[in-house]
Amino acid sequence: MSSRKENLDNLKNFWPDDAPNISQIPKYVDKYKKEKIVIKCGGKVLIDPDLFNKFIEDIAILYKLGIPVIIVHGGGPRIKIELAKLNIESQFIKGLRITNKQTMEVVERALVDFNSEIIEKLKKKECKASGLNVSQNNIFEVEQENKELGFVGKPKKISNKKIQTIIDQQK
């Protein structure tokens, strides 16, 4: 693994001019290196090429500093497009999409595709990255929001142990 000095020297090559002084980095790295940083990225960011590339650059910087990042991403705009292609009209209750089995299949596909794009871009930036399909990894225990919404629920329990195992595999 690279030394901190090597990492800082490498960062100088792409550190933004308008960012805080690069000499300030070590104190923040020390503070957050042992933490799990969770970044929520909305689906709109992922369909805007400029925002998406900036997002990937920011994650790559954190990775190269040794700060573990967990990305939680949305997919609303792409889900909407994919549903429209199949002539599936969405209905909402209080902002939540009513999700039947057919809709859920489209949602899962769209999110897996986004996940793959994020991983591919991060690997091109020499970052270790892996996807996590929560429906296949039993990371969450969920309870149904209400029957009218179908496959919409709230997390009841999150398996930190499984998440930590995945993070450890990335080191």
Where are these regions (language model features)?
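Nucleotide/pyrophosphate-binding catalytic subdomain
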Residues: 1-171
